[in-house]
């Protein structure tokens, strides 16, 4: 009888990938990056172990949203004070906080809990084309489609 392979956290080899967000659709990019972060693109994927790779996203300020979402999509947050509900449109987020916009989209597609928090630490998002991770020798990741 064969046993099912279970990856161990200390045996996982992690790669570094660079993803260029210029002209990419927000949700399609986020779902693929979330899959890489979890390790679902590997044959050694184990649901309860962090088997994913590190991802660097550049040009977050040039992300694309389809339809009229730039004006219609609203991001809500609360200050934890009475009457402290704040809102921003996607256009304001892309202009002023492009990194946060991408991080919110990707983290919403990751597991909620200890594993999700651990996985999200491997995500690095930068608004411009420069990133400080040259020493890790990241590979360029081509998105599907």
Curated annotation (Swiss-Prot):
Subunit structure: Part of the 50S ribosomal subunit.
InterPro entries attached to this UniProt entry: Ribosomal_uL13, Ribosomal_uL13_bac-type, Ribosomal_uL13_CS, Ribosomal_uL13_sf
GO molecular function, one term: structural constituent of ribosome
The keyword Ribosomal protein appears for this protein: yes
Gene Ontology CC, one term: cytosolic large ribosomal subunit
SUPFAM superfamilies assigned: Ribosomal protein L13
Swiss-Prot/TrEMBL GO biological process terms: negative regulation of translation; translation
Pfam families hit by this protein: Ribosomal_L13
Protein purpose: This protein is one of the early assembly proteins of the 50S ribosomal subunit, although it is not seen to bind rRNA by itself. It is important during the early stages of 50S assembly.
Membership in a protein family: Belongs to the universal ribosomal protein uL13 family.
Taxonomic lineage from the root: Bacteria, Bacillati, Bacillota, Bacilli, Bacillales
Key words of the record: Ribonucleoprotein, Ribosomal protein
Keyword Aminoacyl-tRNA synthetase attached: no
Protein name: Large ribosomal subunit protein uL13
Species of origin: Bacillus cereus (strain ATCC 14579 / DSM 31 / CCUG 7414 / JCM 2152 / NBRC 15305 / NCIMB 9373 / NCTC 2599 / NRRL B-3711)
């Amino acid at each position: 009888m064969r046993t099912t392979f279970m990856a161990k956290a200390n045996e996982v080899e992690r790669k570094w990938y660079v993803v260029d967000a210029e002209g990419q659709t927000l949700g399609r990019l986020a779902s693929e990056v979330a899959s890489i972060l979890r390790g679902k693109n590997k044959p050694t994927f184990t649901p309860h172990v962090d088997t994913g790779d590190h991802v660097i996203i550049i040009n977050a300020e040039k992300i694309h949203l389809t339809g009229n979402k730039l004006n219609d999509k609203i991001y809500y947050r609360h200050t934890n004070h009475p009457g402290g509900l704040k809102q921003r449109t996607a256009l304001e987020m892309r202009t002023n906080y492009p990194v946060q916009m991408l991080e919110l989209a990707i983290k919403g597609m990751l597991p909620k809990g200890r594993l999700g928090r651990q996985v999200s630490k491997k995500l690095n998002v930068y608004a411009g084309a420069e990133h400080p991770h040259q020493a890790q020798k990241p590979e360029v990741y081509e998105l599907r489609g």
